[in-house]
UniProtKB/Swiss-Prot annotation:
GO molecular function, one term: DNA binding
Assembly mode: Homodimer.
Function description: Represses a number of genes involved in the response to DNA damage (SOS response), including recA and lexA. In the presence of single-stranded DNA, RecA interacts with LexA causing an autocatalytic cleavage which disrupts the DNA-binding part of LexA, leading to derepression of the SOS regulon and eventually DNA repair.
Species name: Histophilus somni (strain 2336)
Annotated DNA-binding residue span(s): 31-51
Designated name of the protein: LexA repressor
Family: Belongs to the peptidase S24 family.
SUPFAM superfamilies noted in UniProt: LexA/Signal peptidase, Winged helix' DNA-binding domain
Gene that encodes the chain: lexA
Active site: 126, 163
Catalysed reaction equations from the record: Hydrolysis of Ala-|-Gly bond in repressor LexA
Cleavage, annotated site positions: 91-92
NCBIfam families membership: lexA (TIGR00498)
Keywords of the record: Autocatalytic cleavage, DNA damage, DNA repair, DNA replication, DNA-binding, Hydrolase, Repressor, SOS response, Transcription, Transcription regulation
CDD domains: S24_LexA-like (cd06529)
């Protein structure tokens, strides 16, 4: 068995879910059950995390079996594994898939409330009026529980944007905090791929968190 490597926050959640499911039911969960429990868009997202866990040597995937997951080791949650910096993301893929992680910053996720799950580099001046500036690293808490008025990280196709969230019925408005920018309007009945990845919980600027 390969040596254990530190897990990302999301990978730890998947591992813990598998362990709990085995302890409570005597069998591992299916990809569909993992997706439903952790709020993934599809079982394919769960599969990507399972493959990452297998590469890190903490589970074994048995091919051709819906519950073909076997734990290879028990692990403790790391005290401070750092936060992944997310780069360009392809539509339909999990934002925390390994191929999207450009670097890892040794920042304690618990410095932010709620806890941060990843970092996203800010490009442009669309949010400058509330102090989110070009080049900042935005700390993001992964959640689908969004309220109007919150600063969110949204994905439209393969574009990731940081804006203030407002929803009216089936229409979402993503507002800039700069009068030079018009809001982005998303009709949920027409847009084939739109997803909220999380909420902003802090900013890192010049190695200082804010």
């Amino acid at each position: 068995m390969s040596s254990i490597k530190s897990l990302t926050t999301r990978q730890q959640e998947v591992f813990d879910l598998i362990k709990r499911h085995i302890e409570s039911t005597g069998m591992p969960p299916t990809r569909v059950e993992i997706s439903k429990e952790l709020g993934f868009r599809s079982p394919n997202a769960a599969e990507e995390h399972l493959k990452a866990l297998a590469r890190k040597g903490v589970i074994e995937i048995v091919s051709g079996v819906s519950r073909g997951i076997r734990l290879l080791t028990d692990i403790e949650e790391p005290e401070n594994e750092g936060l992944p910096l997310i780069g360009r993301v392809a539509a339909g893929e999990p934002i925390l898939a390994e191929q999207h992680i450009e670097a890892t910053y040794q920042v304690d996720a618990n410095m932010f409330k709620p806890q941060a799950d990843f970092l996203l580099k800010v490009y442009g001046q669309s949010m400058k009026d509330i102090g989110i500036l070009d080049g900042d690293l935005l700390a993001v808490h992964s959640t689908k529980d969004i309220r109007n008025g919150q600063i969110v990280v949204a994905r439209i196709e393969d574009e990731v944007t940081v804006k203030r969230f407002e929803r009216k019925g089936s229409v979402v408005y993503l507002h800039a905090e700069n009068e030079e920018f018009e809001p982005i309007v998303v009709d949920l009945t027409q847009q084939p791929y739109f997803e909220i990845e999380g909420i902003a919980v802090g900013i890192i600027r010049n190695n200082a968190w804010m």
